[in-house]
C-alpha cells in the first residue's frame, strides 16, 4: 500500500545554505519531519550550486518520512546573473536594467525547460523573454 501524503511544502532556498532557522524551520516544523535531516541532505545535493536560489518541493507522508524534488533556479535569478545586474528595473517601461543576447536567452530557456509549461524551445524562449521584459532587461540580437 502506498504511503498517504499529508503535506506538500514548496520553498526557495539558497543552495548549500539551508538551516533550521526561518523560513525552513517554521514551514517544516508543522509537518513533523526531521528538519536537520532535510537541511543536511539538501545542502549536500546543492553544494555545487552555491550562490543560487534552488526551489524545492517537499512531499511529506503520514509516517513523517519525506521526499523532495529540486527544481531549476527562478528565471529572474538566471536573468540577473546573465545580465550582470543586482536587481531588475523599478520602472520597466522607461528605465532599462541591462541586456542579454539571443544566445543567452536560448541557453536560459534550455536550462529552465524541464520546469516550464512549454512544448518546444521557442515557447520556452518566449516565456523567459517575457520575464526579462518585466524586469527591464533588453534582448539584443
Curated annotation (Swiss-Prot):
GO molecular function terms listed in the Swiss-Prot or TrEMBL record: large ribosomal subunit rRNA binding; structural constituent of ribosome
Domain of life: Bacteria
Entry's Gene Ontology BP terms: translation
UniProt keyword annotations, A-Z: Methylation, Ribonucleoprotein, Ribosomal protein, RNA-binding, rRNA-binding
One term under GO cellular component: cytosolic large ribosomal subunit
UniProt entry tagged with the keyword Ribonucleoprotein: yes
InterPro entries for the chain: Ribosomal_uL11, Ribosomal_uL11_bac-typ, Ribosomal_uL11_C, Ribosomal_uL11_C_sf, Ribosomal_uL11_CS, Ribosomal_uL11_N, Ribosomal_uL11_N_sf
Post-translational modification: One or more lysine residues are methylated.
HAMAP family (alphabetical): Ribosomal_uL11 (MF_00736)
Quaternary organization: Part of the ribosomal stalk of the 50S ribosomal subunit. Interacts with L10 and the large rRNA to form the base of the stalk. L10 forms an elongated spine to which L12 dimers bind in a sequential fashion forming a multimeric L10(L12)X complex.
Record-stated family: Belongs to the universal ribosomal protein uL11 family.
Function in brief: Forms part of the ribosomal stalk which helps the ribosome interact with GTP-bound translation factors.
NCBIfam families with a match to the protein in the record: L11_bact
Protein name in the entry: Large ribosomal subunit protein uL11
Organism taxonomic ancestry: Bacteria, Bacillati, Chloroflexota, Chloroflexia, Herpetosiphonales
